[in-house]
């Protein structure tokens, strides 16, 4: 019963929210632009005397943009700080390193073989494969 | 002497080991099968705690754990241009030919696809999830997807339902979207050699206990089924926020001896849990695809599932009993499943799954998509900007500005560090056959 009610009203609720949201944004934008651009004299002539200082019409957007830029710079700086040093052992081992486990060591011929489970290959072996000319052949 | 690799693929996603989930498994298994086909595969993801830097994993899979901090739910903070230098370096070092991004909710994936397209690489995108159209998060996500996919070469979805969803959300041409399902490693998920007796019918549930997976449905379904069938018991594997609700349900209906809660089940132990049961119950509220029911069917279990998203496409009708995501209908479906249980042959079901789904088949089909992407003609910046312009009255212009700036930044990077100055990483040839590895070991001893 509850789910049935939700199904009936759900789409309509979303549509109402969307409609009210878009109208509100348009109205808010118009009010903001009037506040920011119409001179004080005109506003006072039609009886509007009390509104926030026009300074904030410029300041708030600028503050927001600068905050966003600074947040980006901070985030990228944070990432550089979290980079391991070249001498750090975390570039070789970590909490999640897994040795290669050879389960099912006895495999019959023709029997399906599962895809190997995920595991790390030791860096010494990689170096041998990469740079030892004998093994490379 | 190893043959030169056919393709050099970069997989990009925020989600990879040591995280666990469907996307992580998909990337890993697909990579392994592509490696076996002779291609070179590199994975790019962000650092997970101390796991940072470059790792070589099973089969020679190279993984770049870029030191980029996750922001929310293992997704990095969107910086738009912040990843351009590292993406460029990786693409150049590994001589990548195709960039394959995974998951619509992965920030790193979208940024990498954008940068790769700017640099002229072929890009493929795989979408793993369904998203709605009406809530605030989905509206914003769909706009990002429209931007990210406006300029893409090919896309892959894991079910036809997922393809419809992605095409509607992103405005992508349906001709560019391929349907390649997930798969299951049938060699790992085999039925029990001796099937458990049906005197007591065991129903297995393995999923995260969250709202999206329908844990609230379980709270209502389990007591009702236990009341109707005294010989039924449940095994619930998985952990999550709804764990407490299920515990309360056990207490309330005195089902401690008939409902077993296992907690989190590592993927390597999933099979041993599945083979103890006769029926697998999936109560998801939304699914693009459902690997769990593939694994269950491969183990010979009859599946009962909600009829949501791409689930009806996954299994043949005689392997699954579908129900609406409603407790009463699910109870009826379980009743139907119990009635047809005697006709189920686990071994036969496993053999059919082996033919229907395999990661090797997925890799071959993905290979076709890569070849198709490589055949797409290169497009100049102006042509690409035209595509972005058509994304919307205001959004289109904004997208164009973003792409122009991306192009200029790329040129700046080329000025600061030319492509020729980036050192190329040497390749490794890792033998896949165990016998050869042994001989290598012997050779080392000889040295």
UniProtKB/Swiss-Prot annotation, chain A:
Disulfide bonds: none annotated. Belongs to the PIGP family. Coiled coil: none annotated. Keywords: Glycosyltransferase, GPI-anchor biosynthesis, Membrane, Transferase, Transmembrane, Transmembrane helix. This is Phosphatidylinositol N-acetylglucosaminyltransferase subunit P. It is an enzyme of class 2 (transferase). Pfam families: PIG-P. One of its GO terms (cellular component) is membrane. It comes from the Eukaryota. Pathway: Glycolipid biosynthesis; glycosylphosphatidylinositol-anchor biosynthesis. The chain crosses the membrane at residues 16-36, 58-78. One of its GO terms (biological process) is GPI anchor biosynthetic process. Part of the complex catalyzing the transfer of N-acetylglucosamine from UDP-N-acetylglucosamine to phosphatidylinositol, the first step of GPI biosynthesis. It catalyses: a 1,2-diacyl-sn-glycero-3-phospho-(1D-myo-inositol) + UDP-N-acetyl-alpha-D-glucosamine = a 6-(N-acetyl-alpha-D-glucosaminyl)-1-(1,2-diacyl-sn-glycero-3-phospho)-1D-myo-inositol + UDP + H(+). Its EC number is 2.4.1.198. Its main location: membrane. GO terms for molecular function: phosphatidylinositol N-acetylglucosaminyltransferase activity. It is a multi-pass membrane protein. It is found in: Membrane.
Curated annotation (Swiss-Prot), chain B:
GO terms for molecular function: phosphatidylinositol N-acetylglucosaminyltransferase activity. The gene is PIGA. It catalyses: a 1,2-diacyl-sn-glycero-3-phospho-(1D-myo-inositol) + UDP-N-acetyl-alpha-D-glucosamine = a 6-(N-acetyl-alpha-D-glucosaminyl)-1-(1,2-diacyl-sn-glycero-3-phospho)-1D-myo-inositol + UDP + H(+). One of its GO terms (cellular component) is glycosylphosphatidylinositol-N-acetylglucosaminyltransferase (GPI-GnT) complex. It is an enzyme of class 2 (transferase). The chain crosses the membrane at residues 388-408. It is a single-pass membrane protein. Expressed in roots, stems, leaves, flowers and pollen grains. Its EC number is 2.4.1.198. InterPro entries: Glyco_trans_1, PIG-A/GPI3, PIGA_GPI_anchor_biosynthesis. GO terms for biological process: GPI anchor biosynthetic process; pollen germination; pollen tube growth. Keywords: Endoplasmic reticulum, Glycosyltransferase, GPI-anchor biosynthesis, Membrane, Transferase, Transmembrane, Transmembrane helix. Its main location: endoplasmic reticulum. It is found in: Endoplasmic reticulum membrane. The keyword Endoplasmic reticulum applies. This is Phosphatidylinositol N-acetylglucosaminyltransferase subunit A. Necessary for the synthesis of N-acetylglucosaminyl-phosphatidylinositol, the very early intermediate in GPI-anchor biosynthesis. Required for pollen germination and pollen tube growth. Pathway: Glycolipid biosynthesis; glycosylphosphatidylinositol-anchor biosynthesis.
